[in-house]
Each structure stands twice: as C-alpha cells, then as structure tokens.
Amino acid sequence: MQDNWPTRLAITCLLVAIERLGMYIPVGLISNPQANWLNGGGWFVLGIIPTINASIVMQILISIVPALTRLQKEEGEMGQKQIQKYTRYLTFFLAGIQAFTLSQQWCTWLLIVSGAMLVMWLAEQMTHKGIGNGTSIFVCSNIAANFLHHPIEAPWSLAMVVLIFTMLGMIALQEAVRAIPILSAKQLIQSIAQVYLLPMRLNQGGVMPIIFASSTLALLHTWSIWWLYVACIIFFSHFYNLVIANPKELSENLNKMAVVIPSIRPGAETQQYLNRTLNRMSWIGGIALSLIALLPWLFSSLKIFSGFGATSLLIVIGVSIDTMRQIRTYFIANAYEKMI
C-alpha cells in the first residue's frame, strides 16, 4: 500500500458512497428494475455484474487462447494493461446486452451502460487506491445494504449459530495452508539445519469462486439447481488455484533460485509434483467451500434472514476476511519499514 491508512480508508468509503448513490438515481423507463440480484434499480442497475462476467470470460479465454496466455505471462506490465483493456471492452459488450433486456429506449440504454462502465472504473480505483478488492467490496456493500431492509425472522440464537458456524468454516478454509518443505543450495553447501517451507493456500481464490458461481447462476436463471451451484464453485475454485499458483511457473522460479523439494528432482518432476499437489488441494478446497456454502441453505426453510440468502452471507464473510487479511498485511509491512 503506497498511501497511508487513513487516506485509503477515506477513498474506500467515498467510492462505496458514490456507488450506492448511483443505485437510486433514476434513469427513465426500465422494464425490469429487479433484474439485478444485488440492487434495486437506478443508474447503476447493472452494478458490478457485467465486470464480473467479463472477468470470468477473460480468465477462461486466457487459459485456452495461447496468444492471450503469452500476453499475460511474458509481456509483464504492458501485457496486464492490454488484458485489462480487453476486459473493459468485454464489459461494455456484456453491459450493452444486459441493458437492452431492461430498456429498448436509446437514451435509457446508454445511461445504463455508462453506469456499468462507471462502476467498473470505481472498482478499479478502489483496488489501486483503496482497501481490498474493488469488485468484492462493491458486491459486499450491495448485499449489506439489502440486508438492512430485511429483518431477521428466526430467533436470534438460531441466527447466531448459523452465522458463527459459517464464519468459522470460512475462516478455517481461508487460513488453511499446505506447507511444502524446500531446500536451497546455500543450505546444502553450508549444512544449515533450518527447515524452510513453501506455503500454498488451500483456497487461493478466496471468496471469488462463490461470486463467480453466483453470477453464472444468476445469468442462467438456475438458482434452484443446488448441484449446479456446487459444481460451479468447485470448477472456479480449481480454476483459480491453477491460475494464481501455476505449477510450471512455480517450478521455473524454484529452479532459478536454486531451490529444490526434498526427494523431488528439479524441472519436469517438480512441476508434476506441484501439479498433483495443487489438483488435490483444488478438489479439497472446492468441496469444502461448497459444503460451507450449503450450510446456510440447510436452514433456508426457517427464513433466518428474509431476503438475505446463503450466498450473500458467504460473500460478506469471505470479503470481510480477505479485507482484514490485507489490512493486517499492511500494518505488518508498515512495521517492518519503520524497523529498517
């Protein structure tokens, strides 16, 4: 974090306030103001959903199109900017399609699309200048605002039990790490007995697999099919793990640093070992995340939170955990800077 803590907090609050205000600015005739499951209409009726959908499509394209894969991995910062540019174009395209389903009037359509693009820009600014991931924060703020309009119908004791168990499950999953022992050339030469570990998070994507799965089901209008929801979570969890922790890149980086995994040969064998490890972790993490996602659904008949679904609860908890982790990292880094 380049800026100080109060500045980033102020920027985050300001951007969230702007995004929420845009939800209530009327834009004319909208055929279906309830089309977005995260807000209730207005200029920003599409919210962050087009950006999320564009990110999903772009990540899939990067994994299957060699030219985009090279652009992301080999072109460095310029490649990332180009990928971001393509994502913006795709966001505009998807926002245009969704806006047309809401209104066929040219002026209203243009306002809705411009609102979606502005929300995307606000999310980017929050990611770079505020606290946490802008997309996740906007999703969380919209859900929290919706929650304030719906009372808790079940007894507080039952609501707290479900909330606590869900929160504990998310925390355990977010903090779970597989530590792989590694040896450096310096250790071998100097006979250093200290053990170094390569930590790999069980759930690399955090709450993003749930957000992506929810967005996909909302787009397909298939909320009632619970097994499809589980399948989407497992798929996106597996996909995110392989994107964030690429076995080939990890193997090459370890080789460049003259670091090896005990009993595993450098190169292809190390890559295969990391690939097997990540695949197992992806399945375990995806299934665990799905089970946690289904936990509040077991109590759906009790209507603990009227108008506040299980997915919403998980997203709020997950985003809160991710944001707190980033804040903690900032304070630790700041303390180290003062020591130096």
Swiss-Prot record:
A Pfam family that the UniProt record links to this protein: SecY
GO biological process: any one? Answer: protein targeting
Highest rank taxon of the organism = Eukaryota
Protein localization: Plastid, Chloroplast thylakoid membrane
Keywords of this entry: Chloroplast, Membrane, Plastid, Protein transport, Thylakoid, Translocation, Transmembrane, Transmembrane helix, Transport
The UniProt entry lists the main location of this chain as: plastid
Q: Where are the bilayer-spanning segments?
A: 10-30, 42-62, 106-126, 152-172, 204-224, 225-245, 282-302, 304-324
Q: Could you tell me the membrane topology recorded for this protein?
A: Multi-pass membrane protein
Query: What are the record's GO terms for cellular component?
Result: chloroplast thylakoid membrane
Q: Show the Gene3D superfamilies listed in the entry.
A: SecY subunit domain
Q: Subunit details for this protein?
A: Component of the plastid Sec protein translocase complex, which is composed of at least SecY and SecE.
HAMAP family the record matches: SecY
Similarity comment text for this entry: Belongs to the SecY/SEC61-alpha family.
Describe the task this protein carries out: The central subunit of the protein translocation channel SecYE. Consists of two halves. These two domains form a lateral gate at the front which open onto the bilayer between TMs 2 and 7, and are clamped together by SecE at the back. The channel is closed by both a pore ring composed of hydrophobic SecY resides and a short helix (helix 2A) on the extracellular side of the membrane which forms a plug.
- PANTHER family from the xrefs? SECY/SEC61-ALPHA FAMILY MEMBER
Q: What's the name of the protein?
A: Protein translocase subunit SecY
Name the gene for this chain: secY
